[in-house]
């Protein structure tokens, strides 16, 4: 595919700087990713800080380990608090890419969504 080699392709994860800031603060306090996300999601001040930054750009480059940990913590927190059926996913139709579809569908199946 041409897109793989395109110079405009995004090759690294980017996170809204306000969210990354509150994430790092919460991680320093708790040293546990799931507890850190709980602190963020149940603290109105922290929620406001990153939610008000939406639509204003401000994305910064992050590393894969940090982003994957943040995503996993959010999923685990949601499953613990609300149950696995509250996770909604999207995979393209199988005709587009069976590998992409099967990977997403299998992940959702494994977490009980």
Model-identified regions with their sequence ranges:
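N-terminal export/assembly segments and adjacent metallocofactor-ligating motifs
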Residues: 1-113
């Amino acid at each position: 595919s041409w897109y793989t080699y395109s110079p405009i392709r995004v090759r690294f994860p980017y996170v809204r700087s306000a969210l990354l800031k509150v994430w790092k603060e919460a991680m320093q306090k708790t040293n546990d990713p799931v507890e850190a996300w709980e602190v963020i999601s149940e603290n109105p001040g922290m929620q406001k800080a990153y939610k008000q930054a939406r639509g204003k750009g401000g994305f910064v480059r992050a590393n894969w380990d940090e982003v994957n940990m943040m995503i996993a913590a959010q999923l685990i927190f949601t499953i613990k608090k609300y149950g696995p059926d509250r996770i909604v996913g999207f995979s393209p139709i199988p005709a587009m890419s069976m590998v992409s579809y099967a990977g997403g569908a299998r992940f959702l199946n494994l977490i009980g969504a």
